Each structure stands twice: as structure tokens, then as C-alpha cells.
């Protein structure tokens, strides 16, 4: 027996390598494009003027403001931990109430799309 060549799993077996989890959650390009498209149309309608994004280990958040000094009028949150439960997307209203949850970003943004149509009609 040779010293220093100990292989606990045996030759030819692959051992799992303990990796680190993601440092932060982010938006994928198509998701961000969809959100920014809505944001641009809301700016053109005069509803929103500013936005902020926050990326943490648990969630990615996009918040839209009428004025920078106010609380956000809408907040879109991506939380992958909820993917298999109620859906990883959540739309929050101005007072923090949940307006919509779901698995599909387009469906979650639907209340804001309807609000945009009302703003354009006025």
C-alpha cells in the first residue's frame, strides 16, 4: 500500500465538490428587458420618473417611483426560493400590498399594463 494516495471513494468515482451558492439573485436579460419596456412606457405616460434595483442573496427587486423622494408606486420582486410554491414573481403596490404573484412575469405585470392603458386613455 502506497502512502499519500488514499482515495475514499475509490478509483474512477466522482466526488461532489461543495460549491458556494449564488452571491446574489439578478434578472436575466429578457426579464429585465420586459420590466424596462414597461418602465419606459410608464415614463412616457407620466406615471413614473425614477427607478431603483436591489440585488440580494434572496431576491432581486425593481422599484418604480413617481418622485425619487417617495416610496415606490410599484415593486417587482424575483425570489427563486418561491419558484415551486406560489411563483417566483411578486408585484407589490405602493403600500406594500401584494397585487399579483405568479410563475410568469408577463402575467404578474398585467395589472401595471392595465394601469398604463387607463393612464393613456385619460
Give the predicted meaning of each segment.
Residues 5-61:
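Negatively charged, low-complexity tracts enriched in Asp/Glu with abundant Ser/Thr
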Residues 1-3:
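Contiguous mid-protein beta-loop-alpha structural module that forms a pocket-lining wall or clamp
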Residues 72-80, 98-105:
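Short amphipathic beta-strand/extended segments with alternating polar/hydrophobic composition
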Residues 50-56, 73-84:
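Short linear motifs in intrinsically disordered
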Residues 64-69, 92-96:
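Secondary-structure transition/turn motif
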Residues 9-12, 20, 76-96:
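Short aromatic-glycine-(Arg/Gly/Cys) micro-motifs in beta-strand/loop hairpins
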Residues 90-120:
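Mixed-charge, glycine-accented linear interaction segment located at domain edges/termini
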Residues 40-45, 66-72:
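Short, solvent-exposed secondary-structure boundary motifs
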Amino acid at each position: 500500500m502506497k502512502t499519500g494516495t488514499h482515495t475514499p471513494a475509490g478509483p474512477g468515482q466522482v466526488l461532489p465538490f461543495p460549491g458556494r451558492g449564488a452571491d446574489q439573485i439578478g434578472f436575466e436579460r429578457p426579464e429585465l428587458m420586459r420590466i424596462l419596456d414597461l418602465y419606459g412606457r410608464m415614463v412616457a405616460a407620466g406615471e413614473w420618473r425614477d427607478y431603483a434595483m436591489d440585488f440580494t442573496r434572496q431576491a432581486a427587486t425593481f422599484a418604480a417611483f413617481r418622485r425619487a423622494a417617495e416610496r415606490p408606486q410599484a415593486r417587482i420582486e424575483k425570489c427563486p426560493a418561491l419558484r415551486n410554491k406560489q411563483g417566483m414573481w411578486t408585484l407589490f403596490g405602493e403600500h406594500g400590498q401584494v397585487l399579483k404573484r405568479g410563475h410568469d412575469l408577463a402575467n404578474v405585470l398585467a395589472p401595471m399594463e392595465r394601469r398604463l392603458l387607463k393612464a393613456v386613455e385619460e
